[in-house]
């Protein structure tokens, strides 16, 4: 469908990196030249067909794209309503969608002549994907990870070390993703000349939110093509989990100007929105500035960032990507939530009915699917982004279910 650019939901951000009132560049003076250099380098790379050709080659031969669009027939039968499809990004090399973005950014870092890579990680999937591309291209890699997340994601910590990365434990705050990102930003300020900060989600100062979205949009572009081949039409709805929101933005963005497609982002409701122990920034937060951009944040009356809670390390972030905040305000996407308990139930159901063990992150998206699927007509086509596999979560889930391993 052709849409006037001025009326398009896909035309952002503006030249200042804003999506409406969200986004922008709120960084220390020391970092501003780096962020501007990155913006310029990314614009040049986008205009160079050789850059995209290199990404396409690596996506095919190294990552294993395109990922399949899979009809979850037994789940569909179980609910007796909507036809449920999974976009199988958990089948990518390294087990999640994170590699899509890491590949694009590592190729950009090399173009810029950077010789050291740093990153933050929560669930460890972005850390593993970053360590993977650094190993592939022979670049040293430092990963910042909160001590709480290190404890609940031990397999991924070992994978990062095996891949040659240095994993730096972060003890400040609650030892989760927000704290890891703070430390990575401190490192970047101190090592401005040679270091590239490979941010893992659609947050941070401009151009990161747009750049990460662009590298992840392969998910939605493939889905659109695959759905037209399979069903001869676009899906009726899209569902994806939201931490910072890169897997969701990757699925949603190519469909934003297709008004017939309903879009649902699923935040982590933790112990319940009413308890205050959750990570649902849009449902329980307010606009503010964190990590270089203006967006919805969990904060107290004084504007101090509150610590969130989620069973899922990858959703345990007190903010959300600025483009999601804008889509929420414009009403183009609907943001809902799922609790720890609901995600655990969906995790088990998917494993038993489809033979697919999902990561706890997409288990939140599936939890929402389970709430609405049965009430939808049988010709309703729903696509859920299965953005990660659950190997990393089996120990944590066993613990929550009271199973001793």
UniProtKB/Swiss-Prot annotation:
- In Gene Ontology terms, what is one molecular function of this protein? tryptophan synthase activity
Matching SUPFAM superfamilies? Tryptophan synthase beta subunit-like PLP-dependent enzymes (SSF53686)
> Which InterPro entries is this protein grouped with?
Trp_synth_b_CS, Trp_synth_beta, Trp_synth_beta/beta-like, TrpB-like_PALP, TrpB-like_PALP_sf
Q: Which cofactor does it need?
A: pyridoxal 5'-phosphate
Keyword terms of this UniProt record: Amino-acid biosynthesis, Aromatic amino acid biosynthesis, Lyase, Pyridoxal phosphate, Tryptophan biosynthesis
Please identify the protein, giving its name as recorded: Tryptophan synthase beta chain
Recorded GO cellular component terms are: cytoplasm
Q: Which organism is it from?
A: Parvibaculum lavamentivorans (strain DS-1 / DSM 13023 / NCIMB 13966)
Q: Which Gene3D superfamilies match?
A: 3.40.50.1100
Q: Which residues carry this modification: N6-(pyridoxal phosphate)lysine?
A: 98
* Subunit organization: Tetramer of two alpha and two beta chains.
Per the entry, what this protein does is: The beta subunit is responsible for the synthesis of L-tryptophan from indole and L-serine.
Q: In which pathway does it act?
A: Amino-acid biosynthesis; L-tryptophan biosynthesis; L-tryptophan from chorismate: step 5/5
Cited NCBIfam families: trpB
Could you say which EC number(s) this protein's record lists? 4.2.1.20
Q: In which domain of life is the source organism classified?
A: Bacteria
Q: Which reaction does it catalyse?
A: (1S,2R)-1-C-(indol-3-yl)glycerol 3-phosphate + L-serine = D-glyceraldehyde 3-phosphate + L-tryptophan + H2O
Q: Which family does it belong to?
A: Belongs to the TrpB family.
